[in-house]
From Swiss-Prot:
It catalyses: phosphoenolpyruvate + UDP-N-acetyl-alpha-D-glucosamine = UDP-N-acetyl-3-O-(1-carboxyvinyl)-alpha-D-glucosamine + phosphate. Belongs to the EPSP synthase family. MurA subfamily. The keyword Repressor does not apply. The gene is murA. InterPro entries: Enolpyruvate_Tfrase_dom, Enolpyruvate_Tfrase_sf, MurA_subfamily, RNA3'P_cycl/enolpyr_Trfase_a/b, UDP_GlcNAc_COvinyl_MurA. This is UDP-N-acetylglucosamine 1-carboxyvinyltransferase. It comes from Methylocella silvestris (strain DSM 15510 / CIP 108128 / LMG 27833 / NCIMB 13906 / BL2). One of its GO terms (biological process) is cell division. It comes from the Bacteria. The lineage of its organism: Bacteria, Pseudomonadati, Pseudomonadota, Alphaproteobacteria, Hyphomicrobiales.
Amino acid sequence: MDRIRIVGGQELNGVIQISGAKNAALPLMIASLLTAETLTLDNLPNLADVNMLLRILGHHGVDHSVDGRRLGAAPNASRPVHLTARDIVDTTAPYELVSKMRASFWVIAPLLARMGEAKVSLPGGCAIGTRPVDLLIMALEKLGASVEIEAGYVHAKAPKGLRGAEIKFPKVTVGGTHTALMAASLAHGHTRIVNAAREPEVVDLAECLVKMGARIKGAGQSVIDVEGVARLNGASHRVLPDRIEAGTYAIAAAMAGGDVMLEGAEAGLLQSALDVLVEAGATVNVVNEGIRVQRNGAGLMPVDIVTAPFPGFPTDLQAQFMALMTKAKGQSRITETIFENRFMHVQELARLGAHIRLDGDVALVDGVERLEGAPVMATDLRASVSLVIAALAAEGETMVNRVYHLDRGFEHLETKLGGCGAIIERLSG
C-alpha cells in the first residue's frame, strides 16, 4: 500500500495547474446515460473515482474512448473522453460496484428516466433512517416513481415515464439536486426544484444538460425550473476547474509560506475560502492566469469558520483549514454543519502536535509554535490532504499512510507540491 513521505519546513514557490473538478465530473459522466448519442467531456481529472465510475458506467452499457480509441478500465482521463450509452444493457447497479463509490448511486435517475426502471444498491455503510439517499428517493417519488427498498437495493419503477412535479427539499442537497435535474430533464411536463443546491458543480451539470437539449432555468439559484423533453442528444462539455483542489493548494501555500500561482483556478468558485485566507494572513490576488497566493513569513492569525452550502465556506475544505489553524497565534473555532463525523482527522493532527478539542459539531483549535513529523493515517479523502498540509509545516519527517484516499480526489498531488519546492515523495509497498 502506497505511503507519502514529507519533510516539512520548505516554502512553496511556483505554479500549480488546477485540474477539472471531481465533484462536477462524476454527475456529468452519469448524465451520459440519458442519451443514446455521444457525450464528450474535456478536462476530466485522472482520478481513481473517475476511473472507477467509467467501470460502473461500462456495466450499464456505456462505451468510452479517448482520441477515438477504446480503452480499458483506467484510461488516461485527462484527455477528452467520449461516452456513448447507445444501448442500456443492465438497469441494475450491484452492491459490489456501488459500494466502491457512493456517488455511483446517482445512476438511478438517468436509468429510471430513460428506461422506466432502475435497481440500485444502497451505498455501503448507509444506516436506515439517516442515509443520505432518502432525499434522492423522495425526489424520484415526487416525479411519480414507485420505489421499494428491499434486501439492500432501491428498486424504482416508472413504466409510463416520470411526471413533472414540485420537489421541495427540506434541506439543501447536492446529490438530491443532481438527481432531480437528470430525472426531470426527461419527465413529462414541468418540474420545479425548491431549495435547490447552488453549488457550481450543480450549475455545471445543468449547463451540460442544456447543451444536450434539456430545458432548464434558474441553475445556481434556490429555485430551478425544468421543462421535460422527449429525448436528449449528445454534446461536448468542458468540466469546470476544481474549487476544492484550488482551495486546498491555496491553504497549503498559506501554511508553508511562499508564492504560488494556481493556474486555471476561478476565484468566483471559492470566494468564501479566499476571504478567510486573507483574514488568516495570506495575500490573495486574482489575475488573468488564475489565483496567486502568498505568505511572506508573517504569523498566521486565528479565524473562526462555519461550513455552509455554497456560497458559504465549503465543508470539503474544513479539514484543510483546520490544519492551517494549528499554527495560528491563538484559538480558532470551526463549526461543521453539513456532515456528521467529519472530524476524523483531529486525532491524526494531534499526533503531529496539534491542540484541538471537540465539542459536538465544534472544534476548538489552539495554535502551537511547532508541529513535529510523525507517522499518521489517512481516514478519508479530505482528512488525508489535511495531514499533508500540516506535514508541510512540521519539523522533520511525516509519513502519511493509506494514501489511496488521496488518489480518489487529487490528481498528481505529490508532483504538484514537489514542483513548488516541497520535499515529498510517494513510496510504494
